[in-house]
Amino acid sequence: MIYLIFLSPNIGLGESVEIYIRDQLDENRGYCLDIKGYKLKAKITNGLQAHTCYSYQGEIAVDQAFDSLKLTKNIFFLPVFDVCMESESIAVSATIRLNKCNYGKLQQFKLDIKGRIYPSSDIKLCLTVEQGQSKKGRGGSPVHLKRNLTLQPCSNALRPYQIWSTRTSN
């Protein structure tokens, strides 16, 4: 007998991790990569932002949950929404969005041992949290904070806004 096995791209998922900026900046709960919107109601068409990490509530929120196994393959995959992090281009000030996973150049990012996240095709551009004053979200107590994300030149001056880590929960 011959058995055919069809593999879904989601078979072999790793555990969920949140990706957070190591410097807490102005948010003692920390900032995590987050789909704009609220948890399951998040809208993938609105892209990614840095937002108060939800793990202070005891678990990783679905709109901040990345697949740890795919991260090792340079893919920032959000399994609940079946989308990947993508840059609009490989250029300074490019925004970060979400799209169906195609594993193309715009979706390949590396998280290196120094904590930098950069496009696999350009080690000199880092995923960067917006500087300046954060914006208030709509929920949380105290109110959650959020900031935009772009690609910027990797630099020591921007280190607090460019160094990331992963964790399974707080």
Regions found by a protein language model. Give the residues of each.
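Classical Sec-dependent N-terminal signal peptides that target proteins to the secretory pathway
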Residues: 1-11
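Lectin-like carbohydrate-binding module/patch detector with strong preference for beta-trefoil
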Residues: 11-170
